[in-house]
Amino acid sequence: MTALLETPVRRSRRDWRLLWSAGAISSLGDGAFLAALPLLASTMTTDPQLIAGVTAWGTLPWLLAALPAGALADRLDARRTLSFVQLAQALLIGALAVLVMLRSGGILAVYAVAFAVGLAETLAKVSGQRLLPVVVDPAGLEKANGRQNAALFANRQFLGQPLGAFLFSVAAGLPFWVDVASFLVSALLVRSLSRSAPGVADRRALRSEIAAGVRWLASHPLLRTLSLLAGVANLANFLAMATFVLFVRDRLGVSDAAYGVVVALTGVGGVLGSFLSARIVGRFGGRRTVLTTLFVTPTAMIVLGLYAHDIVTLTALASITTFSASLWNVAVMSLRQRTVPAELMGRVASVGLLLAFGTQPIGALLGGLVAGWWGLAAPWIVAGVVRLVAAVASLRPLTRWPTSA
């Protein structure tokens, strides 16, 4: 824990610890929420397409609202915005917890809350990306991003998801109350930061501000390619993961509580990759690291779909994918934070997030269809093939990666 909290390159040790702690605590609640939501849906239906709909509705806001969220984030104070949005998310999830306890609502209520929480998350995500470069110097971005990623994987998958699944097996509303508490504490910590990324006064119409971010990213061949690759990767990832709860329960025959343990074990690679990311990127460079992940991840996904018939094989292969994802995230996020002008960070980040996350609901819906047509293993194979094709197509543009990054 001490190593995680050590300031990467000092601007404010206190602010770094507050920001890291806020992310770590909210990730714990997110994990409980993400484990409990599909389990809650599975008590209402066993239809793969309806189960996948939970993920689709939760990620649809990225397709609809990412660009306006980025423009708004650049206008608003990042610290105040993030803390306010987290309070709103606590209120929304608290409402779902009450419905669960009263045994009212149904799959449509789950969809509605997933959508509303996802809508708030678009603004929270962009505001959070604006805060880190204020707290950490550019030379420490890889280390800071790696430590934030490590906290996210460890708390969301190792702790949050098993906790959420276990609490759901005890009382269905409990994991949602854990998420409410995590958002409240995180909002308080963010509000306590002494530094922030202030809003940029701009009298232009919101549409013009959005267009400025789009033009900047479109004119940068490397970041444009990486954003498109992230979109394809997330489409494929959600195609595979949308029916994962059914894949694990039907193929491995595990209980609800054991499902959370399986999900936690798949995050081993993510935590390890986050700890090692700064060292690996520093040793081999961002370009070589990203190119390696582009081919390792889809290969592991295809093998998982074909041969994962036991927990050991499944978690080993899934850990390879999460290890690669951590390296990718740290290398690409650090490059973006180092390259994009501060006054455009929210808008450019939101365009990248639109391309990366806007494909998630499409992938989730396709995952439900593919699983319904060809079985629960098919989404992993299809997703791996899609990512391999994208990797081959991106080889030439990635030669533009700067040697200093």
Name what the model sees in each region.
Residues 1-405:
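Alpha-helical transmembrane-bundle signature of multi-pass membrane transport and export proteins
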